[in-house]
Amino acid sequence: VVDTRNNNIYVTWTQFDSYNSTTPGDSTIILFSKSVDAGESWSAPLRISKIAGTCLDGDNAVEGAVPAVGPNGEIYVSWAGANGLVFNTSSDEGVTWLTQETPIDPMPTGWDYDIPGLMRANGLPITLCDLSDGPNRGTIYVNWSDQRNGPDNTDVFMTRSTDGGVTWAPTSKINSDNTDKHQ
């Protein structure tokens, strides 16, 4: 994501010690890096996930981190893992982050699920921040999908925070059907 105030570029990703490893001690973590020169060079990767996941590419791995920028340059990142959907933030261009992830939603059935006819289905989060000049400026939105209502009922969910990610509104189901359908 690009911070349009200063043109900094922020990226986050999952690092696997050894992809699909079952070796104890191998883990996944979320890393952050930034460029202040249009991508010519990058800062050393910084770990922003305090709780690691497993290296098995599934619900217990930490994955899906995509940054968003707030109106004053805040960096917001959510991702999914064994502890559900979590959030971290930086208010100083990525130099420091919260000391522990903030829980958003338990994602009771995880982010990796089956949908007939698809090789793979993931309900990983997307994080956005309202940068408009309207009344919702600064509101952080996170949406994802999961199968909490049954294995044949994939639904789309959203939550929002109006205080920089300190607290989160109750999770809302977005799709309006009440049937066993995949969204």
What would you call each of these model-derived segments?
Residues 5-12, 72-77, 133-142:
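Entry beta-strands of beta-propeller and related beta-repeat scaffolds
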Residues 1, 59-68, 115-128:
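Signature of short aromatic-glycine-proline-rich micro-motifs recurring in repeat-based ectodomains
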Residues 15-17, 81, 144-148, 176:
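Transmembrane beta-strands of outer-membrane beta-barrel pores
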Residues 33-55, 83-115, 149, 154-179:
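Asp-box/BNR beta-propeller loop motif
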Residues 20-28, 80-83, 120, 149-154:
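Short, solvent-exposed loop/turn segments at conserved positions within beta-propeller repeat blades
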Residues 120-147:
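A conserved active-site cap/scaffold subdomain adjacent to cofactor or substrate pockets
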Residues 11, 32, 77, 87, ...:
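Hydrophobic strand positions within the blades of repeat-based beta-sheet folds
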Residues 1-31, 44-64:
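Asp-box/WD-like beta-propeller blade repeats and closely related beta-sheet repeat scaffolds
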